[in-house]
């Protein structure tokens, strides 16, 4: 039967953990600037954005996600409470060649990557006699190969161990419900072992994605490539390694994002006050790349947010892409999801263009949506729900 006019096409499930408290890990070989990057990211966040900053663990922090739409709502409502969206970032100790076989505490570090949901793959493209390189000389393309292969080898070990168990059950005519998983694992084996490729590039079906999500393979995680330049190269926008790194990424991870930055440049910015920062950025004709990195990392986790906004609070509520209105309401309170009646929605752009909620309503830009509505990034939403005693207005004051 053809779908109804207003039905949405069926969405494939997302690869990765389901949830909103997802983490992105900083991965690379030793001495490429991971901790420097982590420190400037966390140090710059609170002072620059005037948001509360929280260190979860010594090597894990959450950083506010910058957004001009959020800033506009804060300026418009001047609320008592301000809560942005956050990106959880983990600094993972350096991986060395042979990590998948346990070299250099490799298994511990690889398990830390497994606990993350996406990867900032950081490589070093600067010379510094005071910072030795674990492989003796700087070669970011070689470093990319090392990390890429160590992740694949760890997945190979994980796959073969679990495939062997499945094979024994399926071959004996055991649990027939495991046959689709077994078939998916054979497809994964072909890509990972026979073709020696990472898993995130394939067009997997829903059964395959179930298997990928069950075993949380490292090479199925989204990767964003960060290239750490010297401040001199960053300012002059030239580095001999960048074309070679881009060539490697285009060949081995087509479509992946590459963001050059300079830990040294960012560190200098953290030591300046706001006026000095602006003057230095004007002088060098360069800006901090941290905002771009944070936003890219957040989107790489398949996350987005909707806003609730009023004089008491402006808040960005993190959801996964494709979330329906009742589940989005449940982010605020479980009662909102259980008793969901409708969502009253304005797109941010409509609110800004019309100048107020009343004007948006008058212009027909304030819409009532039912439980099949898929929330869009940047929606301003007021939920109506039934809490048993009658209609309640879940509008943020």
UniProtKB/Swiss-Prot annotation:
Provide the binding site for ATP.
31-36, 229
Q: Where is the OBG-type G domain?
A: 22-281
Q: Which domain of life is it from?
A: Eukaryota
* Gene Ontology molecular-function annotations: ATP binding; ATP hydrolysis activity; GTP binding; metal ion binding; ribosomal large subunit binding
Keywords, alphabetical: ATP-binding, Cytoplasm, Hydrolase, Magnesium, Metal-binding, Nucleotide-binding, Phosphoprotein
Q: Which Gene3D superfamilies match?
A: 3.10.20.30, P-loop containing nucleotide triphosphate hydrolases (3.40.50.300), TGS-like domain (1.10.150.300)
GO CC, sorted alphabetically, is: cytoplasm
Cross-referenced Pfam families, in alphabetical order? MMR_HSR1, YchF-GTPase_C
What protein family is recorded? Belongs to the TRAFAC class OBG-HflX-like GTPase superfamily. OBG GTPase family. YchF/OLA1 subfamily.
State the oligomer form and interacting partners: Monomer.
Name this protein carries in UniProt: Obg-like ATPase 1
Q: Organism source for this protein?
A: Drosophila melanogaster
């Amino acid at each position: 039967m053809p779908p109804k006019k207003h039905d949405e096409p069926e969405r494939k499930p997302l690869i990765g953990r389901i949830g909103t408290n997802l983490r992105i890990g900083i991965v690379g070989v030793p001495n490429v600037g991971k901790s420097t990057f982590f420190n400037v990211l966390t140090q710059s966040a609170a002072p620059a954005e005037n948001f509360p900053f929280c260190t979860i663990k010594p090597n894990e922090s959450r950083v506010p996600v910058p957004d001009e739409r959020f800033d506009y709502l804060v300026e418009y409502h001047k609320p008592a409470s301000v809560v942005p969206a956050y990106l959880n970032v983990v600094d993972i100790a350096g991986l060395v060649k042979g990590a998948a076989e346990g070299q250099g505490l490799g298994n511990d570090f690889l398990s830390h990557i497994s606990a993350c949901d996406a990867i900032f793959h950081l490589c070093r493209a600067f010379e510094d006699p005071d910072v030795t390189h674990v492989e003796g000389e700087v070669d970011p393309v070689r470093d990319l190969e090392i990390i890429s292969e160590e992740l694949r080898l760890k997945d190979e070990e994980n796959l073969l161990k679990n495939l062997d168990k499945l094979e024994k059950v399926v071959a004996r005519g055991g649990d027939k419900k495991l046959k689709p998983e077994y078939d998916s694992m054979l497809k994964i084996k072909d890509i990972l072992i026979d073709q020696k490729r990472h898993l995130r590039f394939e067009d997997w079906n829903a059964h395959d994605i179930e298997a990928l999500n069950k075993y949380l393979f490292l090479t199925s995680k989204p990767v964003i490539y960060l290239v750490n330049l010297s401040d001199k190269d960053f300012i002059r926008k030239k580095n001999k390694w960048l074309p070679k790194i881009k060539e490697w990424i285009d060949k081995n991870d087509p479509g992946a994002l590459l963001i050059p930055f300079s830990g040294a440049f960012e560190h200098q910015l953290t030591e300046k006050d706001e006026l000095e920062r602006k003057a230095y950025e004007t002088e060098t004709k360069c800006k901090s790349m941290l905002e771009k990195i944070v936003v890219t990392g957040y989107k790489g986790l398949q996350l987005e947010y909707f806003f609730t906004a009023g004089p008491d609070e402006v808040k960005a509520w993190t959801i996964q892409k494709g979330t329906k209105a009742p589940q989005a309401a449940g982010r605020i309170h479980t009662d909102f999801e259980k008793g969901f009646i409708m969502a009253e929605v304005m797109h941010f752009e409509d609110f800004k263009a019309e100048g107020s909620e009343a004007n948006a309503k008058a212009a027909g830009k304030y819409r009532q949506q039912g439980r099949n509505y898929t929330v869009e990034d940047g929606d301003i939403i007021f939920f109506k729900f039934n809490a048993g005693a009658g209609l309640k207005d879940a509008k943020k004051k």
